[in-house]
Swiss-Prot record:
Compositionally biased residues, Pro residues: 869-880
Alphabetized GO MF terms: actin binding; ATP binding; integrin binding; JUN kinase binding; molecular function activator activity; non-membrane spanning protein tyrosine kinase activity; protein kinase binding; protein phosphatase binding
Annotated ranges, domain FERM: 35-355
Keyword hit for Kinase: yes
Post-translational modification Phosphoserine, affected residues: S29, S54, S580, S722, S732, S843, S887, S910
Residue ranges of domain Protein kinase in the record: 422-680
Reported function: Non-receptor protein-tyrosine kinase that plays an essential role in regulating cell migration, adhesion, spreading, reorganization of the actin cytoskeleton, formation and disassembly of focal adhesions and cell protrusions, cell cycle progression, cell proliferation and apoptosis. Required for early embryonic development and placenta development. Required for embryonic angiogenesis, normal cardiomyocyte migration and proliferation, and normal heart development.
Topological relation to the membrane, as annotated: Peripheral membrane protein
InterPro entries: Band_41_domain, FADK_N, FAK1-like_FERM_C, FAK1/PYK2_FERM_C, FERM/acyl-CoA-bd_prot_sf, FERM_2, FERM_central, FERM_domain
Full protein name: Focal adhesion kinase 1
Pathological condition linked to this protein in its record: Aberrant PTK2/FAK1 expression may play a role in cancer cell proliferation, migration and invasion, in tumor formation and metastasis. PTK2/FAK1 overexpression is seen in many types of cancer.
Effect upon mutating K1044E: In a metastatic melanoma sample; somatic mutation
Length: 1052
């Protein structure tokens, strides 16, 4: 089955639906054939039923099975084998049922020659029904609803105007009951409800035109009300089953009938009936009982062709088990014979539980038959490669495997070696089928050659042994400096594969251990070397299928080699695929590989892009924290891995090209090799330039120091960048928040302040963590190196005599921290001397929903009373010193659960103290407290809650707010008139806050299962906390009004 792609950006919507029946087939632009297919189906959506469709992108090798699979997968259908694909001509009654093995491109070429593409309509339909299909479909709700919509549509189009009035009324009322199942049984008794159904929805959606035209409006209304009451207690599923029960006597939707003739020479005109209950039967007269011909389990082969007479009728031949001669059916045309053959073949596949077709197609003139596959002895299998290909291989890998000379054999020498020449050493790794050991091979050329030895755990059976040796059979094809070389095999039990030893182990572990010592040029070098190996494989027309850092071995510090060629053979075994689903590298695989098990050179390009990302991330695995089942959803929603720190924009742009959803838009390995070579040369040139600048600075420092023992000056203030470039690039939190990873234009400059802030302040590091879905720890960020300004003289010699270099750096960092804290203290002093210290709305502006002060991400709001002008606030304590950090008990931010790694603990936040009033019977105070509690409860539950639970939680907050506002309305008349305006403004602000919370909730539901879901959850928390804070402000306003009223009533 070839790959097809459901394009989320092209989904059909009501606004873009066609007004006529034209434009429903293949779309194409002038001069080029667009690989886009519009497929109509009966999966319900919010639009009109006539516009239910999916837009599918497909490749040249896509077959009909791939199109069907893609659509039904998105609806979680169980009975996939029941679905068929129909092509209809809109200007005639021409209908073609497309077999699942037909290629979509060949279908277009064939039928668009006869009619323009806009005159064709592609439909997904349920055609093949199992016995007792309704009972089976009740366990598969998407299929049951699909079949109901299909049958209802056929009924309305074909026979609705001919059925009895009572049946039409019942069927129409059952559809009303199903559509509005929450509606009470007597709801249509009310005139307003009936008018909504009649005018807004339209009765023609439920009843045939003949009934609406023949019955007066008042009479029809009474008939509908009476009939609807009969089904008042049915739920949706019961309404569907009742619909089928009433319709089946007048319309046999469970079988298809064809007017044809039995025999070829002496023929009998009959009506052939094909269905799950009858099997293959025929009727000679309408009133007679059907005569059974055969069951689907008896059909062995199906053939069809044109008859040899002048009428060119279609001939269908069925080879039936136990019958002396084939059953011959003469159809009016070859098209009808093809449609009958597809129907019988679909039923045969369904009842036999196989995807193998029973149709034998005649060999066309000019086609050559495939050669027979020779059966080789074991000794022959060891010495040579056979081109025997299983059926599953030809289906999945038609673009890769060829009957011609696919591989160039490097040599014909025998790879079998003697076991006594191998000295088995310690185990250095564990594989899927066995362990890997270090060893010594005593060859004639080298008596002590270090080798790696793969052993097989369970190689007693021939099948396991052959699968294990397949990797050796594959590796012997290649001779490349960056591909692990095969040295030999031992085919006798226990089976061993001997390969060259890469002493530094697998690349992923190597990157993790050496991440602080490897520079960017080395990382790009590894990617480039892998691209040369994969370009070599591409030239050999070979697909690796498991490109990942764990399968790359490090031969030396400047040489890596691609290994592990075993998965390609194992993936071809469908039984192994199903049994070992968890072992598939889902997070590295291309979307067409995940969906259809289709592996091509383009899917290798995708995996290589992920492998490059791993290298740049120093061995971090992709999509950490994401379930395998959720990966394909994120990819199809446009999400890609983020740009790694220190990654050049040109390299990340190249990665994103590797991750194009359409395989045809991905670059080839030859292009990747050339572009990586260019990027590597650029990085080497930049590295040399940095080294020259560094050496000049060192010389300047040594020349200018003059033996001074003065302590080094403090680094420059934040916001005044140093001329010196940082050693690497580390994005700021603002850049890390970007969810569109294709945007590389936000690549910041090379000033050292960004890297410095990321390492000095743990709070900043946590901000990086919380926006990164893959939980990179702040320890991965390199330590800040002190900036040395050109105008500053730093005596390294004098310092070195007193302090070691690392202590000197710690002193510089401590001075930088003190300078930052001094700056914050001055800002706070200036702010606190202002007359209005009321809590600012800026305290809820943080993205993670936690409360903070109005100054910025690092400045937490400090509540104080009126400061004494003679005594400014105390200077804040040094980091690590005991302070009065706390959290607001009533408004603690649960959004911290989004943050992974180091948590940024908010300091205590409290508005100006509440007035000292008697609260014993204060309804406003009680309701404000109730609202705050509702916000806290919602905040504690929102993180793990599914989207359908958002509405009840927000509803509780809304009810608490409504109660509060009603209480305030009762209190306002008792307060001075001069305060009413301020109270009303505070009430409006609360209503606005609730509206904002509802909007954020809708966005969080809309973008569920995407990279934006967490972002909108955070915004929900932010809106909820704003609501709670403004409720407290409303209480303060009312308290001030009460105090004012008390002041006016006091005697003077």
């Amino acid at each position: 089955m070839a790959a097809a792609y459901l394009d989320p950006n092209l989904n059909h919507t009501p606004n873009s639906s066609t007004k006529t029946h034209l434009g429903t087939g293949m779309e194409r632009s002038p001069g080029a054939m667009e690989r886009v297919l519009k497929v109509f189906h009966y999966f319900e959506s919010n639009s009109e039923p006539t516009t239910w469709a999916s837009i599918i992108r497909h490749g040249d090798a896509t077959d009909v099975r791939g199109i069907i699979q893609k659509i039904v997968d998105s609806h979680k259908v169980k009975h996939v084998a029941c679905y068929g694909f129909r092509l209809s001509h809109l200007r005639s009654e021409e209908v073609h049922w497309l077999h699942v093995d037909m290629g979509v491109s060949s279908v277009r070429e064939k039928y668009e020659l006869a009619h323009p593409p806009e005159e064709w309509k592609y439909e997904l339909r349920i055609r093949y029904l199992p016995k007792g299909f309704l009972n089976q479909f009740t366990e598969d709700k998407p299929t049951l609803n699909f079949f109901y919509q299909q049958v209802k549509s056929d009924y309305m189009l074909e026979i609705a105007d001919q059925v009895d009035q009572e049946i039409a009324l019942k069927l129409g009322c059952l559809e009303i009951r199903r559509s509005y199942w929450e509606m009470r049984g007597n709801a249509l008794e009310k005139k307003s409800n009936y008018e909504v159904l009649e005018k807004d929805v339209g009765l023609k959606r439920f009843f045939p035109k003949s009934l609406l035209d023949s019955v007066k409006a008042k009479t029809l209304r009474k008939l509908i009300q009476q009939t609807f009451r009969q089904f008042a207690n049915l739920n949706r599923e019961e309404s569907i089953l009742k619909f089928f029960e009433i319709l089946s006597p007048v319309y046999r939707f469970d079988k298809e009938c064809f007017k044809c003739a039995l025999g070829s020479s002496w023929i009998i005109s009959v009506e052939l009936a094909i269905g799950p209950e009858e099997g293959i039967s025929y009727l000679t007269d309408k009133g007679c009982n059907p005569t059974h011909l055969a069951d689907f389990t008896q059909v062995q082969t199906i053939q069809y062709s044109n008859s040899e007479d002048k009428d060119r009728k279609g001939m269908l031949q069925l080879k039936i088990a136990g019958a002396p001669e084939p059953l011959t059916v003469t159809a009016p045309s070859l098209t009808i014979a093809e449609n009958m053959a597809d129907l019988i073949d679909g039923y045969c596949r369904l009842v036999n539980g196989t995807s193998q077709s029973f149709i034998i197609r005649p060999q066309k003139e000019g086609e050559r038959a495939l050669p027979s596959i020779p059966k080789l002895a074991n000794s022959e299998k060891q010495g040579m490669r056979t081109h025997a290909v299983s059926v599953s291989e030809t289906d999945d890998y038609a673009e890769i495997i060829d009957e011609e000379d696919t591989y160039t054999m490097p040599s014909t020498r025998d790879y079998e070696i003697q076991r006594e020449r191998i000295e088995l050493g310690r185990c250095i790794g564990e594989g899927q089928f066995g362990d890997v050991h270090q060893g010594i091979y005593m060859s004639p050329e080298n008596p002590a050659l270090a080798v790696a030895i793969k052993t097989c755990k369970n190689c007693t059976s021939d099948s396991v042994r052959e699968k294990f040796l397949q990797e050796a059979l594959t590796m012997r094809q290649f001779d490349h400096p960056h591909i692990v070389k095969l040295i030999g095999v031992i085919t006798e039990n226990p089976v061993w594969i001997i390969m060259e030893l890469c002493t530094l182990g697998e690349l992923r572990s190597f990157l993790q251990v050496r991440k602080y010592s490897l520079d960017l040029a080395s990382l790009i070098l590894y990617a480039y070397q892998l691209s040369t190996a994969l370009a070599y494989l591409e030239s050999k027309r070979f697909v690796h299928r498991d490109i990942a850092a764990r399968n790359v071995l490090v031969s030396s510090n400047d040489c890596v080699k691609l290994g592990d060629f075993g998965l390609s053979r194992y993936m071809e075994d469908s039984t192994y695929y199903k049994a070992s689903k968890g072992k598939l590298p889902i997070k590295w695989m291309a979307p067409e590989s995940i969906n259809f098990r289709r592996f091509t050179s383009a899917s290798d390009v995708w995996m290589f892009g992920v492998c490059m990302w791993e290298i740049l991330m120093h061995g971090v695995k992709p999509f950490q924290g994401v379930k395998n089942n959720d990966v394909i959803g994120r990819i199809e929603n446009g999400e890609r891995l983020p740009m790694p720190p220190n990654c050049p924009p040109t390299l990340y742009s190249l990665m994103t090209k590797c991750w194009a959803y359409d395989p045809s838009r991905r670059p080839r390995f030859t292009e990747l090799k050339a572009q990586l070579s260019t990027i590597l040369e650029e990085e080497k040139a930049q590295q040399e330039e940095r080294m020259r600048m560094e050496s000049r600075r060192q010389a300047t420092v040594s020349w200018d120091s003059g033996g001074s023992d003065e302590a080094p000056p403090k680094p420059s203030r934040p916001g005044y960048p140093s001329p010196r470039s940082s050693e690497g690039f580390y994005p700021s939190p603002q850049h890390m928040v970007q969810t569109n990873h294709y945007q590389v234009s936000g690549y910041p400059g090379s000033h050292g302040i960004t890297a410095m802030a990321g390492s000095i302040y743990p709070g900043q590091a946590s901000l990086l963590d919380q926006t990164d879905s893959w939980n990179h720890r702040p320890q991965e960020i390199a330590m800040w190196q002190p900036n040395v300004e050109d105008s500053t003289v730093l005596d390294l010699r004098g310092i070195g005599q007193v302090l070691p270099t690392h202590l000197m750096e710690e002193r510089l960092i401590r001075q930088q921290q003190e300078m930052e804290e001094d700056q914050r203290w001055l800002e706070k002093e200036e702010r606190f001397l202002k007359p209005d210290v009321r809590l600012s709305r800026g305290s809820i502006d943080r993205e993670d929903g936690s409360l903070q002060g109005p100054i910025g991400n690092q400045h937490i709001y400090q509540p104080v009373g009126k400061p004494d002008p003679a005594a400014p606030p105390k200077k804040p304590p040094r980091p690590g010193a005991p302070g009065h950090l706390g959290s607001l008990a009533s408004l603690s931010s649960p959004a911290d659960s989004y943050n992974e790694g180091v948590k940024l603990q908010p300091q205590e936040i409290s508005p100006p103290p509440t007035a000292n009033l008697d609260r014993s019977n204060d309804k406003v105070y009680e309701n404000v407290t109730g609202l705050v509690k509702a916000v806290i409860e919602m905040s504690s539950k929102i993180q793990p809650a599914p989207p359908e639970e958002y509405v009840p939680m927000v509803k509780e907050v809304g009810l608490a707010l409504r109660t509060l506002l009603a209480t305030v309305d009762e209190t306002i008349p008792l307060l001075p008139a001069s305060t009413h305006r301020e109270i009303e403004m505070a009430q409006k602000l609360l209503n606005s806050d609730l509206g904002e919370l509802i909007n954020k909730m809708k966005l969080a539901q809309q973008y569920v299962m995407t990279s934006l879901q967490q972002e909108y959850k955070k915004q929900m928390l932010t809106a909820a906390h704003a609501l709670a804070v403004d409720a407290k402000n409303l209480l303060d306003v009312i308290d001030q009004a009460r105090l004012k009223m008390l002041g006016q009533t006091r005697p003077h």
